[in-house]
């Protein structure tokens, strides 16, 4: 079972050696170049999956690579977009760029001064 062995599935060393010899996988050069899940699904080298990042409750046993889920790529791109926007807004909080709140604060500080100036001419 080489690199394709599931992390949750435990086998002894003897069992795994027997399975490898039965499968005819004595030459593992291609398996060592890929990640542990890539050789299992036949993904091209260098391609990974965004699996396990967000799992809705009750959806643990659903295979997202099956043809029943045609919107998988659009869901991934939506997830990436949402996370990117959150990250970018989070990063702006500590930046030195002026935010939209500063002009409002300046107006509030100036308004009592203007009101005070308007009251003086009325008195005199």
Swiss-Prot record:
Biased composition (Basic and acidic residues): 1-10, 34-50, 101-124
Tissues expressing the protein: Expressed in Testis.
Stretches with biased composition (Acidic residues): 11-30
Tree of life domain: Eukaryota
Region ranges (Disordered): 1-77, 90-124
Protein name: Testis-expressed protein 54
Organism: Homo sapiens
This protein's encoding gene: TEX54
């Amino acid at each position: 079972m080489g690199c394709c062995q599931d992390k949750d599935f435990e086998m002894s060393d003897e069992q795994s050696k027997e399975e490898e010899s039965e499968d005819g996988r004595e030459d593992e050069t291609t398996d060592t170049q890929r990640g542990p899940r890539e050789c299992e699904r036949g993904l091209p080298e260098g391609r990974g999956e965004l699996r396990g990042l967000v799992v809705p409750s009750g959806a643990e046993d659903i295979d997202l690579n099956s043809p029943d889920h045609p919107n998988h790529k659009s869901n991934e791109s939506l997830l990436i977009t949402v996370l990117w926007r959150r990250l970018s807004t989070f990063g702006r909080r500590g930046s030195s760029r002026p935010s939209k709140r500063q002009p409002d604060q300046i107006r509030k500080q100036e308004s009592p001064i203007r009101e005070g100036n308007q009251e003086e001419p009325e008195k005199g």
